[in-house]
């Protein structure tokens, strides 16, 4: 996860790796020294966590499912010819051959069929649903164009590089002048109110360190590849426009959320990270992970890292419209505490289990498709870890509208709808809590992962 840092105060210090090895196990949250800058950021982040928590999660899941129903019903009425239905059945990403844009899920339906998307990029910020629905990223700031794929200066990053962009003060909407491969020398410290928007280019973050969102608020990560991420050795790294810090070795997570709030990760393709693909810990909440594609990894998502971190009871995350693909082993996600809405995802492969956790997380699984592996010992979707039945039988793990294939099965516990107070503003009865069923998932996830957006064309 996130590594450690030390304020330089304008001076340059040299620390040996042996010093870091001694300090690292003793630090709080991997922070070697809390200077006034990071103490303030941590304090602000805790306030954001508490303020971003929704005491009525059922209202959020209702809102989400309502919009899915509206979008699917509208798309079905527009696209009911035999040719178009055949295309959807035949596989993913074949819909453009008809010359029409099909966007069944409401997030994509909000923006993706606009041929003028490149001149209206910030429309994307109006489209997020789920627990991260208030995320706007850099909507209120100017466009920043990344023109240089290098990452050679970690202390004073070169203008025009991604590292320079994400460490600026204030909101920015970050786009890319061309396709590029960015090999991060050390973890990329992203500050608040940023959008990383890879549309119109092929942007690969690969064969280097990953992305870190530590004690930040309001970030969108959209339409990029994150592949072959490795641990960083740590060292002096700029973590904001006015601050440079000393970091210990990073774990090799693809995207690491540490005390991060109002985060939206959308249309990301992720493969082979040294540790987790997406980890959200230590008070991270108000997060939506959507329309993404995951392959070739052991431990995909970790939500909550330690039993003693009870702040993660405030954790609320939506996992929606994703494709969990080939050669994945477990943790899709693995949860400690919190409320996790897992909805309309396609689980086509897992080797051990799909969804697991401990410390009484609430897991609401709705309208997913689960295809179990051939191994008879791995057909159970769920796994409660380090907890006897007498304790976990009261946890609220509910399945509704899921589609089970090849012997897959979900072991439920708790009582239906006991996990939330009644909605403050109930929606029409037709849509209350009712997801689109797992049989619809192929349509809802058919464009999961990075989109090949071209100027003047629908994505």
UniProtKB/Swiss-Prot annotation:
Cofactor (UniProt): Ca(2+)
Designated name of the protein: Probable pectate lyase 3
Secretion signal, residue range per the UniProt entry: 1-29
UniProt keyword terms in alphabetical order: Calcium, Glycoprotein, Lyase, Metal-binding, Signal
Keyword Secreted in record: no
Organism the protein comes from: Arabidopsis thaliana (Mouse-ear cress)
UniProt-listed InterPro entries: AmbAllergen, Pec_lyase, Pec_lyase_N, Pectin_lyas_fold, Pectin_lyase_fold/virulence, PEL
Annotated gene: AT59
Active site per UniProt: 331
Biological process annotations from GO: pectin catabolic process; plant-type cell wall organization
Top-rank EC class of the record's enzyme: lyase
Tissue occurrence: Expressed in pollen, but not in leaves.
Pathway this chain belongs to: Glycan metabolism; pectin degradation; 2-dehydro-3-deoxy-D-gluconate from pectin: step 2/5
Family of this protein: Belongs to the polysaccharide lyase 1 family.
């Amino acid at each position: 996860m996130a590594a450690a840092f030390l304020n330089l105060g304008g001076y340059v210090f040299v620390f040996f790796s042996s010093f870091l090895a001694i300090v690292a196990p003793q630090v709080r949250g991997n922070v070697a020294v809390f200077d006034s800058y990071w103490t303030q950021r941590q304090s602000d982040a805790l306030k954001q966590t508490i303020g971003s928590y929704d005491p009525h999660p059922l209202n959020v899941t209702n809102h989400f499912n309502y919009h899915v129903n509206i979008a699917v019903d509208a798309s079905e009425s527009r696209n009911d010819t035999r040719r178009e239905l055949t295309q959807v059945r035949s596989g993913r990403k074949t819909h453009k051959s008809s010359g029409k844009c099909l966007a069944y899920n409401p997030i994509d339906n909000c923006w993706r069929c606009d041929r003028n998307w490149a001149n209206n990029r910030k429309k994307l910020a109006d489209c997020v649903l789920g627990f991260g629905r208030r995320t706007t990223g850099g909507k209120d700031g100017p466009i920043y164009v990344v023109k240089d794929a290098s990452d050679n200066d970690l202390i004073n990053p070169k203008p025009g590089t991604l590292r320079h962009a994400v460490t600026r003060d204030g909101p920015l909407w970050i786009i890319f002048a061309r396709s590029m491969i960015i090999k991060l020398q050390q973890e990329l410290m992203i500050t608040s109110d940023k959008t990383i928007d890879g549309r119109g280019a092929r942007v690969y973050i690969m064969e280097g360190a990953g992305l870190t969102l530590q004690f930040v608020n309001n970030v969108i990560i959209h339409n990029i590849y994150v592949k072959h991420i490795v641990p960083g050795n740590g060292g002096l790294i700029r973590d904001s426009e006015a601050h440079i810090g000393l970091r210990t070795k990073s774990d090799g997570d693809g995207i690491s959320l540490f005390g991060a709030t109002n985060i939206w990760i959308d249309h990301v393709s992720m493969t082979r990270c040294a540790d987790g693909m997406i980890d959200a810990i230590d008070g991270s909440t108000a997060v939506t992970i959507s329309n993404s594609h995951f392959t070739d990894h052991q431990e995909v998502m970790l939500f909550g890292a330690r039993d003693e971190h009870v702040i993660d009871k405030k954790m609320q995350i939506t996992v929606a419209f994703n494709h969990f693909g080939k050669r994945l082993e477990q943790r899709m996600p693995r949860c400690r505490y919190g409320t996790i809405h897992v909805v309309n995802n396609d689980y086509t492969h897992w080797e051990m289990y799909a969804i697991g956790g401990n410390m009484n997380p609430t897991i609401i699984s709705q309208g997913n498709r689960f295809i179990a592996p051939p191994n008879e010992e791995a057909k159970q979707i769920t796994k409660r870890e380090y907890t006897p039945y007498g304790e976990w039988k009261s946890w609220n793990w509910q399945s509704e509208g899921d589609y089970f294939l090849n012997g897959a099965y979900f072991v439920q516990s708790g009582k239906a709808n006991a996990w939330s107070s009644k909605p403050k503003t109930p929606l029409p009865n037709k849509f209350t809590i009712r997801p689109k069923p797992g049989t619809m998932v192929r349509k809802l996830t058919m464009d999961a992962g990075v989109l090949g957006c071209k100027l003047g064309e629908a994505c």
